[in-house]
Amino acid sequence: MTVTRPVSASLAKAFFYIVLLSILSTGIALLTLTSSLRDAEAINVAGSLRMQSYRLGYDLQSQSPQLNAHRQLFQQALNSPALQNLNAWYVPQAVKSRYGRLHANWLEMNARLIDGDLNWYQSNINNYVDQIDLFVLALQHYAERKVMLVFGISLAGGIGIFTLVFFT
């Protein structure tokens, strides 16, 4: 039996790769989780847009003096920091496009609210709420994919470490 290199060198090399794999998998997992910090807030804000849309219709129908205040609250929710973060480069295009459609349709809805066009609003509110629902669903799927990514990275790191420990 011939030893080609010292055991300490093999152990040092294996230890180095184990530490490197641990740092890489942990770092990527932490970056992914950091990008998830506002996911729940974004889903809650997006979901609240549904209720606010119906409230605006009620305000319009009842000629409520609260209509302008509620329009401003809707605008603030639509432009909240949690939703504005969805314009980042790493957010899937499906989420960005649904958010963009909500914005574009809000401009029309807001103009109709200002004009007091109740018939138009009643005819279009269900479609707008359906768009909100699809947006919330896209956000939920995006958040779930990030969790699965963290799981996959952690699993790959664990398998890599296991391989190094038992085959080095």
Q: For the regions a protein language model found, what residue spans apply to each?
A:
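A ubiquitous short alpha-helical element
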Residues: 12-15, 38-44, 89-98
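Interfacial "cap-and-anchor" motif at the non-cytosolic start of specific transmembrane alpha-helices
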Residues: 40, 146-164
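Extracytoplasmic
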Residues: 43, 48, 52-59, 98-152
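Juxtamembrane loop-transmembrane helix junctions in multi-pass integral membrane proteins
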Residues: 2-9, 31, 35-38, 135-138, ...
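Alpha-helical transmembrane segments
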Residues: 14-17, 43-46, 153-159
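Extracytoplasmic ligand-binding sensor domains of the Cache superfamily
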Residues: 58-112
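Extreme N-terminal signal-anchor transmembrane helix of membrane signaling/transducer proteins, especially
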Residues: 5-33, 159-167
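Juxtamembrane membrane-water interface segments immediately C-terminal to a transmembrane helix
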Residues: 32-60, 64, 68-72
